[in-house]
Each structure stands twice: as structure tokens, then as C-alpha cells.
Amino acid sequence: MTNNLAGEFAHCACCVLGIRGSLVRDERPVAAAVTAALMDAQEWVAENPDEAAAIFAGFTKVATAEQLAPMLRSHAHHHHPMDGDLKQEIALYAQELKLASVFKSSTGPTQFADRVCVDVLAA
């Protein structure tokens, strides 16, 4: 068992933001604002893991702030791939999902990434 902090995935995004296609097409400034806000929040968590853990601990009964803070410190919150870099990372994940039979064998990883990735922050 591994995670995305080791091996070939060590420098890949661990999370992506899915935004409804109509929002991207019809209200791109809103999609861009949501994306920018999430990136700002990621940076804040990375810079303030103890405070973030204390805030989140109030919403869970399964972990304390003291348990959560080290988890937050281990995450790659400073990694924000955009456009071509994001597409490459998504294609890598898609290939792995094919190998695990989550995606159909006919799914083209590059084509999948091209279809689902949109850089809403691009001018």
C-alpha cells in the first residue's frame, strides 16, 4: 500500500477541483474565483497546520487536532499544477486507473485529461 507522496506520484497533485461544465462555460469568473480561493486555502493550511487542525477538529469526532496537524504537514499543499502540467498528471493517474480496471481499457489517458482539464485561471 502506498500513497501519492511516494514514488512516481510524489510530485503529482493529490486533489483536483471538479467544476460543472456549465459554470466554466457560462460563469468563468465565478469558476476562477472558486479555484483561486481553494488554492489560497491550501496555502494557508500548509503555512498554518496547527491552526487548521484545531479548526477542523471541531467538525470530527474521530481525530484530535494533535493527530490531524502531522497529517496536514505531510500533504503537498504547495503543488498547484496548471494547464499542461495538470493534464500530464491527470493522464498519469488515468493510466493507473486503467491498470486497476477502474477505467475501461479503451480509455485514452491523454484524451481523458484533455477532455476534463480546463485552466479557468488562464487569461
Predicted regions and their residues:
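Pocket-lining segment of extracytoplasmic ligand-binding domains
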Residues: 1-58
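An extracytoplasmic/periplasmic, membrane-proximal ligand-sensing/linker region
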Residues: 51-123
